[in-house]
Amino acid sequence: DKFDLIKKGDFWLSETPDTASIGWDAVLPRICSWGHFKCKDTGFEFLFFNLHMDHIGKKARVESAFLVQEKMKELGANLPAILTGDFNVDQTHSSYKALVSNGVLKDSYESADFRYATNGTFNSFDPNNFTESRIDHVFVSPLFKVKKYGVLTDTYRSAKATGTEKANVKDCPEEISIESYEARTPSDHFPVKVELEY
């Protein structure tokens, strides 16, 4: 309810972005969705982009990074932008560097006043996995102030496939009943939450 959607669209991450296609060395068709928003209270306008880069094509990821920035200029050269998604590369890859090296965008992780990231963003459905790699990113125009950044690593518990059993817990009051459940993640990626100010 805070924003009005002025315009929206999609384009393909390929050499022919206006036509359904697979780009460069990618193995799957990939798109980027975008919206032009206006804040009802302040009149502030911005572009929001969300994409899913290819998981195999290295050239496709780099070229997609350049293409998205071209589209930002085409759709609103004077408008600040937010770019989110599963980039399928971490902060060491050349496509990541292509997004942050020219001053058009900055990584909200690097820019945040307060950061909570005890793990990376990909977990492969295993809550015990740990990585420092962040493959899900939130890039923003320099105009935005990044107040907070967080990788939310919450898990939930469900009964094991073999059934529930009483947990072997020592020094537990007899009034407490604890069953041995399994920790699970809602997705193979952890969500990223960012608080921005403009």
Predicted region positions:
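Generic anion/oxyanion-binding catalytic loop in active/binding sites
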Residues: 24, 57, 182
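A short local loop/turn or secondary-structure capping micro-motif enriched for an aromatic residue
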Residues: 14-17, 56-58, 155-160
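Structured beta-strand-rich core segments of catalytic domains in phosphoester-bond hydrolases
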Residues: 1-45, 148-152
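Short coil/turn segments at secondary-structure junctions
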Residues: 52-55, 178
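Metal-dependent phosphoester-hydrolase catalytic domains
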Residues: 3-6, 63, 72-81, 89-198
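His/acidic metal-ligating clusters that form di-metal
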Residues: 29-49, 58-99
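Conserved hydrophobic/aromatic beta-strand scaffold that supports enzyme active sites
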Residues: 10, 32-36, 50, 137-138, ...
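Hydrophobic pocket-lining residues within nucleotide cofactor-binding pockets
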Residues: 13, 51-53, 87, 144
